[in-house]
């Protein structure tokens, strides 16, 4: 359902309304999720090993090493091998949901940082027994838990008064931008401190256009600022922003913001803003047209003269 709606007056009589909604179809039915589709090809993930039978027993003292891997079709490519002596281990598997190399793990803490914009996911495998020297252990049936919320923006131009949206870019600012994922309890904790991430579109050309997905840290009762720069009817508009308060984003859920642009004062066509008085209607063709200025007038055949 709808979380919050805010309306804001804008320049040239072009108003902006933002509403943030939850998408039930994008919600997982289990704690561990392959929602959004199975993990994409070329996604990099890391396996960190601790000589502990349980995740609760993990510490920097029993750290045993890490390996980096990348999905490639039905196989896994090794970027950095994880080699372990005989023993019982807990594996922490994590990924930021992209193909980029993950920053080297230093074992300064049994945790890793996460920020808005990252599709952070984890899998914990405890009690792994490595029994034979020289053997290979296969870590199968990995099902990642998604810790962030998936999010996108839909920009909407007013039908009948505006042309298509042909360019769009924006930002989203939230009160919590950074978080820490703890290996010992498999939880992500966000810290206070605002931050901004980009929202992008791929060659938009329609009256309503969806952005690419990005990912946001879970947060409750948050003030979220959406700012857009876009082109409507070949007319550019910059720094159009609105702030919604009381927004809640839950992990492993999908949300979207509808950003609607409307006007009652004219028409945005051909790179210009036309006053209402510029519009005329031709009865023979049953079509509307726009005069090049507000000095030209027209009247119905049975109307009195204007002057």
Residue spans of the language-model regions?
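Sec-type signal peptide cleavage vicinity
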Residues: 1-268, 274, 280, 285-290, ...
């Amino acid at each position: 359902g709808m979380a919050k709606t805010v309306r804001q007056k804008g320049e040239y009589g072009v108003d902006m309304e933002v509403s943030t909604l939850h998408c039930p179809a994008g919600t997982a039915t289990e704690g561990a999720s392959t929602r959004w589709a199975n993990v994409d090809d070329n996604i990099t993930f890391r396996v960190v090993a601790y000589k502990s039978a349980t995740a609760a027993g993990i510490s920097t003292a029993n750290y045993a090493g890490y390996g980096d891997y990348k999905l490639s079709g039905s196989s896994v490519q090794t970027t950095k091998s994880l080699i372990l002596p005989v023993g019982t281990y807990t594996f922490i598997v994590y990924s930021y949901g992209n193909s980029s190399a993950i920053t080297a793990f230093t074992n300064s803490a049994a945790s890793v940082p996460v920020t808005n914009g990252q599709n952070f996911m984890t899998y914990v495998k405890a009690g792994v027994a490595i029994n034979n020297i020289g053997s290979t252990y296969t870590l199968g049936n990995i099902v990642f838990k998604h810790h962030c919320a998936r999010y996108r923006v839909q920009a909407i131009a007013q039908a009948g008064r505006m042309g298509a949206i042909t360019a769009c870019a924006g930002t989203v600012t939230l009160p919590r931008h950074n978080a820490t994922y703890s290996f010992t309890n498999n939880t992500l904790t966000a810290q206070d401190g605002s931050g901004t991430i980009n929202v992008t579109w791929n060659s938009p050309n329609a009256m309503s256009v969806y952005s690419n997905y990005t990912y946001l840290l879970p947060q409750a009762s948050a003030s979220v600022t959406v700012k857009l720069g876009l082109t409507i009817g070949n007319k550019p508009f910059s720094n159009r922003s609105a702030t919604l308060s009381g927004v809640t984003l839950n992990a492993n859920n999908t949300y979207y913001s509808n950003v609607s642009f409307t006007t009652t004062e004219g028409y945005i066509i051909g790179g210009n803003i036309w006053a209402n008085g510029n519009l005329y209607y031709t009865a023979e063709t049953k079509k509307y047209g726009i005069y090049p200025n507000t000095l030209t007038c027209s009247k119905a055949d049975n109307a009195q003269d204007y002057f």
